[in-house]
Amino acid sequence: MPMDTETKQSGDLIFRSKLPDIYIPKHLPLHSYCFENLSEFNSRPCLIDGANDRIYTYAEVELTSRKVAVGLNKLGIQQKDTIMILLPNCPEFVFAFIGASYLGAISTMANPLFTPAEVVKQAKASSAKIVITQACFAGKVKDYAIENDLKVICVDSVPEGCVHFSELIQSDEHEIPDVKIQPDDVVALPYSSGTTGLPKGVMLTHKGLVTSVAQQVDGENANLYMHSDDVLMCVLPLFHIYSLNSVLLCALRVGAAILIMQKFDIAQFLELIPKHKVTIGPFVPPIVLAIAKSPLVDNYDLSSVRTVMSGAAPLGKELEDAVRAKFPNAKLGQGYGMTEAGPVLAMCLAFAKEPFDIKSGACGTVVRNAEMKIVDPDTGCSLPRNQPGEICIRGDQIMKGYLNDPEATARTIEKEGWLHTGDIGFIDDDDELFIVDRLKELIKYKGFQVAPAELEALLINHPDISDAAVVPMIDEQAGEVPVAFVVRSNGSTITEDEVKDFISKQVIFYKRIKRVFFVETVPKSPSGKILRKDLRARLAAGISN
């Protein structure tokens, strides 16, 4: 029976899920929670390596993760220490993450395609003591590792001075140290720019991730219904919280199989779906777009897929319709997340065990065991249904805060526990959430975050640039791409290509600036804030160089 979804609390209008609250075992460490029902699916496939079809059973994954915990401990990793996982999707990513959880240690995940400077910045900020990576990426941390006595573990070949991952697996799992993990201890430290500024470490706790996974897959009528006969396609990078949480951790909790793809390749992707009878496809809009546009799709039987979920960026109605035609038996819907929110705030109720009707373009309904409100960004007053305002969420799933940044934490989470998302949306009469705009400054390139402030800091470092602002430009393939408005220094003749080259040498591919517009001044408010609205309006009006 749907519960009452709207209440008033000290003047605030609060929205809750149509699904009733459930018991969540928040006292359990994350690994204990994920493997709580292990005996039911010990011998079932847990990880399927798409590269070589190697299958790891649940028993093997649990045992290997404990061995890795002991191996990490022998290399000096103690409770509350941080390891950096610098890997594409692979079984070792899973063993390392779960192994660290067993120790009460913290995993910070970084994109292996980051530049050396970006990797080192995160390793330093997170105080990582070990980096787990592939040989081809080890060079990115080589100098930093030597200077800071950092151990580098490689999962494939072993460059000089590195340790092979197999050494961790040779440990005796019975030697695992006895650690007392508290629910509020941090287990994952992804980096996010939040609503503004430079990337910051987001402290996600055991209790927070347990709560978030439970909100999705636990309960008699689970919001995201999955079971041990399901096969999930894990093509989204596990270093991204959406994949780590809604694919890996949710699947482990229910005993489903996880088909791991290192990277998205449409032909291999389409071959793997019928080969392994994939049933659940968690995607992002660029993958949905590739499926909708690929002529190859019609050559493959995709009838095994029963759920297609899209997140990380909004999906337009046309794209929804186009992809629906490609998956004849699938329910298609969206979720809405933000790293700081743990990450899932809303999930499509068409995915529930007892599904609800949903509207096209909605990004779900607030998850159970949580509260949502919509506030006027100027006054902070809560707003009724159908009125757009800033989306705020409260619940045990949200982050503990930003690492070593109490000011940014206080700007994001109110004293009453409300997390401000920086996204503008409204809740309609059927409790469905629609995103209409972003207060926050982030650019979303194919679902990846690009922080304008990070690119602006690099641009302003160039001697021929006196000021700069970066804003998103709409792009059919990527959703948004970063473009720069640049003020040349006196006498400078720097060109668009020179600016683009200067940036592309310092950042990962998706942060590269796609267009440069030279301007006399960057518009700013009296307090010095860049007026990005004005720059976006100039783009929309068709600015010319």
Swiss-Prot record:
Per its UniProt record, what Gene3D superfamilies does this chain match? 3.30.300.30, N-terminal domain of ligase-like
Keyword Ligase present in the record's keywords: the answer is: yes
Question: Where do the annotations place ATP binding?
Answer: 192-196, 200, 334-335, 339, 423, 438, 529
Query: Where, in this chain's numbering, is (E)-4-coumaroyl-AMP bound?
Result: 242, 246, 312, 334-335, 339, 347, 440, 444
Domain of life, per lineage: Eukaryota
Q: Which EC number(s) does UniProt give? A: 6.2.1.12
Pathway in which the depicted protein is active: Phytoalexin biosynthesis; 3,4',5-trihydroxystilbene biosynthesis; 3,4',5-trihydroxystilbene from trans-4-coumarate: step 1/2
Q: Which PROSITE patterns match?
A: AMP_BINDING (PS00455)
- Tell me its cofactors: Mg(2+)
Please verify whether the record's keywords include Nucleotide-binding. Answer: yes
The residues the record assigns to binding CoA are 263, 446-447
GO-annotated molecular function: 4-coumarate-CoA ligase activity; ATP binding; CoA-ligase activity
GO biological process, any = phenylpropanoid metabolic process
* InterPro entries reported for this sequence: AMP-bd_C, AMP-bd_C_sf, AMP-binding_CS, AMP-dep_synth/lig_dom, ANL_N_sf
Region entry SBD2, spans: 335-402
UniProt entry keywords in alphabetical sequence: ATP-binding, Ligase, Magnesium, Nucleotide-binding, Phenylpropanoid metabolism
| Region described as SBD1: spans on this chain | 265-334
Q: What is an example of a Pfam family matching this protein?
A: AMP-binding_C
Record's catalysed reaction(s): (E)-4-coumarate + ATP + CoA = (E)-4-coumaroyl-CoA + AMP + diphosphate; (E)-4-coumarate + ATP + H(+) = (E)-4-coumaroyl-AMP + diphosphate; (E)-4-coumaroyl-AMP + CoA = (E)-4-coumaroyl-CoA + AMP + H(+)
Please explain the role this protein plays, according to its UniProt record.
Carboxylate--CoA ligase that may use 4-coumarate as substrate. Follows a two-step reaction mechanism, wherein the carboxylate substrate first undergoes adenylation by ATP, followed by a thioesterification in the presence of CoA to yield the final CoA thioester.
The record's comment on protein family reads:
Belongs to the ATP-dependent AMP-binding enzyme family.
Notes on the domains = Both substrate-binding domains (SBD1 and SBD2) are involved in the substrate recognition, and are sufficient to confer the substrate specificity.
This chain's protein is named 4-coumarate--CoA ligase 1
The protein's organism comes out as Solanum tuberosum (Potato)
